[in-house]
């Protein structure tokens, strides 16, 4: 982390001489992110987005910074924007699934399985957008034993095609459909 801390002053100096240099700003935003200085990282990535609103990477790295700060709802917004600006870029959708997967831990048994199902569905969406995204395939397989089983649905009286709202993680605000 010390090399990241040592990079801040020189980068800020360079930016003071060339305030719209996207390369310097990107490095500075990433350095602040590595140092867990979310406020500064957010400021830099917001500035980058204003300078280059059509650059998918700025939204993506902003999303990663927010994710690492635990601001999952805001991170999802940036990941979705990155995918949109990137004309269906799959990697940010993979990260959206990762946000859901990371959030499942605070839920009880069945609710946790439903959140994992949402994560798995989101990974499937990313994989359908880019069949070379092997990380998505890996996560789909890793979660295969963590999603609701036929017995889970049966004992809860949930029918195939029934919508199941996710309520244990407030920021998600989505539902999944029982297979």
Predicted regions and their residues:
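Terminal, low-structured helical/coil segments at or just beyond the last alpha-helical repeat
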Residues: 125-179
